[in-house]
């Protein structure tokens, strides 16, 4: 597909890399000459130095025959303007990143009036993810499928869970838990396990289950399941605003620490149910005086990654509450993986994942389309949900007879109101949603899960 990408910041760079690696013809547009030249030299993309809201620049980029137009500059208004001009000048799908909370209640109106195909608000998405984690504090990561009915949950295995030396196939009968272990991180590597795989203390385990079955499983292995009742948030940006709204709607007591007096006053007016403290959140004595040791959750949301990391490490030393850390710079994820920071949230990953998911779905106008895509475990694993629109080599055949690719696990089938953890005798049918976890990147269609070389 021909894609025009306006904006070459962190998200734009991640998109240029991912989309070009998947074989798309990507043209990057930005006013920053150095950034454009860097992307041209680093990835297989074209580049134009210019304003993405200029019809002349858009024409030079080939807007007339573009399939997708993506605007991820640092300005919401510029992103919307670029998309509006792109829709007028071409016949493409337009995607905009819009971050300002003042637009949050107007997104549907904006999409309809301008004709934008999709709008992504990374701060709102991050707030929703953090809210899920605080409602299920035993998990370090939660992704949702099937409209929220199915969850992919990650946790750290310790001696307290009593699963050291247990084979995965023994878990359902041993714990009476209908869950499926999908991936295990061990010694720096990632394994897509089979039933004979034996768990060890220290493993980072990712499993799939319904919310009810996940809750029951965590109870069986002595993991915390009660939602937090209070939250101490350091940093009063957009994520803190959205998160506070989510938490207060669920009757969680919220305290926000914001060092900027004007912003603290603004938050106090916008969030009358929250306690807003105009203080320096990096002041350790202040945090202790505000009850850090008894807080059920601590969320570091400042604009400085290093400060968030240090704050979380300090909170870990003094609190047994749920810890959540926001990180913006994607290149630090391998370093952070070695630190015990609780749950780490990457808003920029969410933006990139959403847009890549949308582009992949557009490629498959017929057949089995991607409905949901997550890149998990430090971008080493993809979890995908496909909608089955037509019969293929993957449908109507017992799963035990399908020749699946290596390092791929078919985890779940949703059929109407039914959620199936599949067994060998189950079959994929037209109308199903199918969830797979794989080490292979770039799957576009359900048929891609089959090992063509192994078919007889």
Feature names for model-found ranges:
Residues 1-456:
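Cytosolic regulatory regions of ion transport systems
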């Amino acid at each position: 597909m021909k894609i025009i990408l306006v904006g070459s910041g962190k998200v734009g760079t991640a998109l240029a890399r991912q989309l070009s690696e998947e074989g798309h013809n990507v043209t990057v547009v930005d006013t920053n000459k150095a950034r454009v030249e860097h992307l041209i030299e680093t990835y297989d993309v074209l580049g134009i130095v210019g304003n993405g809201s200029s019809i002349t620049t858009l024409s030079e980029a080939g807007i007339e025959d573009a399939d997708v137009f993506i605007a991820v500059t640092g300005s919401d208004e510029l992103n919307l303007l670029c998309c509006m001009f792109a829709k007028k000048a071409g016949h493409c799908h337009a995607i905009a990143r819009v971050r300002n909370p003042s637009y949050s209640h107007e997104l549907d109106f904006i999409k309809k009036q301008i004709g934008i195909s999709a709008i992504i608000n990374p701060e709102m998405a991050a707030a929703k993810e953090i809210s899920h984690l605080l409602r299920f504090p035993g998990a370090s990561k939660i992704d949702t499928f099937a409209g929220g009915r199915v969850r992919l949950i990650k946790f750290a295995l310790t001696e307290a869970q009593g699963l050291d030396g247990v084979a995965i196939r023994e878990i359902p009968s041993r714990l009476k838990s209908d869950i499926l272990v999908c991936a295990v991180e061990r010694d720096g590597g990632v394994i897509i396990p089979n039933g004979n795989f034996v768990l060890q203390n220290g493993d980072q385990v990712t499993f799939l289950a319904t919310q009810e079955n996940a809750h029951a499983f965590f109870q069986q292995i002595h993991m915390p399941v009660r939602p937090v009742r209070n939250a101490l948030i350091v940093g009063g940006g957009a994520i803190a605003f959205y998160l506070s709204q989510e938490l207060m709607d669920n009757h969680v007591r919220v305290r926000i620490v914001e060092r900027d007096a004007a912003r603290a006053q603004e938050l106090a007016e916008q969030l009358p149910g929250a306690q807003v403290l105009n203080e320096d959140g990096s002041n350790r004595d202040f945090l202790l005086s505000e009850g850090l040791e008894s807080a059920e959750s601590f969320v570091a949301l400042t604009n400085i990654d290093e400060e968030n990391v240090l704050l979380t490490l300090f909170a870990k030393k003094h609190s047994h509450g749920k810890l959540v850390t926001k990180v913006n710079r994607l290149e630090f994820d391998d370093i952070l993986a070695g630190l015990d920071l609780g749950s780490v949230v990457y808003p920029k990953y969410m933006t990139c994942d959403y847009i890549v998911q949308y582009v992949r779905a557009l490629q498959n106008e017929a057949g089995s389309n991607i409905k949901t895509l997550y890149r998990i475990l430090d971008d080493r694993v993809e979890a995908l949900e496909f909608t089955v629109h037509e019969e293929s080599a993957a449908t109507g055949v017992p799963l035990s007879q399908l020749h699946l690719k290596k390092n791929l696990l078919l985890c779940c089938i949703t059929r109407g109101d039914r959620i199936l953890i599949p067994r060998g005798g189950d079959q994929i049918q037209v109308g199903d949603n199918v969830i797979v976890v794989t080490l292979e990147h770039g799957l576009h269609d359900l048929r891609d899960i089959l090992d063509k070389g192994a078919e007889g």
